[in-house]
Curated annotation (Swiss-Prot):
The lineage of its organism: Bacteria, Bacillati, Actinomycetota, Actinomycetes, Bifidobacteriales. This is tRNA (guanine-N(1)-)-methyltransferase. GO terms for molecular function: tRNA (guanine(37)-N1)-methyltransferase activity. Keywords: Cytoplasm, Methyltransferase, S-adenosyl-L-methionine, Transferase, tRNA processing. Belongs to the RNA methyltransferase TrmD family. It comes from Bifidobacterium animalis subsp. lactis (strain AD011). It holds the Pfam family tRNA_m1G_MT.
Length: 275
């Protein structure tokens, strides 16, 4: 996978050379390149922003600077005509902008993007980027995606890009030392739940014991305990995920556990009963 990141602080992404991401680059699983947006400016001050049209506080990132940069990284001629009906080619780059006003980035998005061959991330700053930038590239057949990583605002897109990048790349074949480690993680799979609690040795620590079933040696009971714990934990912390489950995919014990937690499971999806 090829990854290009555009930022006014490209050195922020030096951290990507550490840990598993760094090792994955050394092994050739992915190539990460960070670019300074100011490289595509032409004035002495290397300006990348200007005042908002219509007034208002702050500064907005200029479309002409971004366009020169993205034309080069995406391989699009500056005079490429608009085509409202153009569909992105299967192997074309995906252009991604973090945006606090955009849909929430999810594990499902990470999974889908892990199959792309080339990702280009644009890091906004100040009051954000001119809204015509994503519009322009969509009209030229680029797969443009905007994502939020939560209901809050950051100083720039660099943190959000780092979050998305790690979520995506760890799903690449060969990235993780043990591929099974991602199978039961939170939000994984169509019927996603929060992951069950994890424990390690010693079995008793400062007066707190691990659940006895986990040291019973009975793998069937262990699996059932973990499944029930995941259901309980998800019901308590993220009931919205329970409400998305397919009742037809639940086994008898799943149904029993959810009913004990106050869920109706006779329909297509579970429904929380009133207390």
């Amino acid at each position: 996978m090829d990854i290009d990141i555009v930022s006014v602080f490209p050195e922020y992404f030096d951290v990507l050379n550490l840990s598993l991401l760094g090792k994955a680059q050394e092994r050739g699983l992915l190539a990460v390149r960070s670019h300074n947006l100011r490289q595509w400016t032409h004035d002495v001050h290397q300006s990348v922003d200007d005042t908002p049209v219509g007034g208002g506080a702050g500064m907005v990132m200029k479309p002409e600077v971004w366009a020169e940069c993205l034309d080069e990284l995406l391989g699009i001629p500056a005079d490429a005509p608009a085509n409202a009906h153009a569909a992105p080619a299967a192997d074309s780059p995906v252009l991604i902008f973090p945006n606090p006003s955009a849909p929430l980035f999810t594990q499902q998005d990470a999974t889908a993007l892990s199959h792309a061959e080339h990702l280009v991330f644009g890091c906004g700053r100040y009051e954000g980027y001119d809204a015509r930038i994503p519009q322009y590239y969509r009209e030229r057949g680029v797969d443009v995606r905007e994502y939020s990583i939560g209901d809050y605002v950051l100083n720039g897109g660099e943190v959000a890009v780092s979050v998305m990048l790690e979520a995506i790349t760890r799903l690449l074949p060969g990235f993780m030392g043990n591929a099974d480690s991602i199978v039961e993680e939170s939000y994984t799979g169509e019927n996603a739940l929060l992951e069950h609690n994890q424990y390690t040795k010693p079995a008793s620590w400062r007066g707190i014991d691990v659940p006895p079933v986990l040291i019973s040696g009975d793998h069937g009971r262990v699996n059932r305990f973990r499944r029930d714990e995941a259901l309980e934990k998800t019901s308590r912390l993220r009931p919205d995920l329970i409400a998305r489950l397919d009742c037809h995919a639940l086994d008898k014990q799943d149904r029993k556990t959810l009913m004990s937690l106050g869920w109706e499971v006779s329909g297509e999806h579970p429904r929380k009963l009133e207390d």
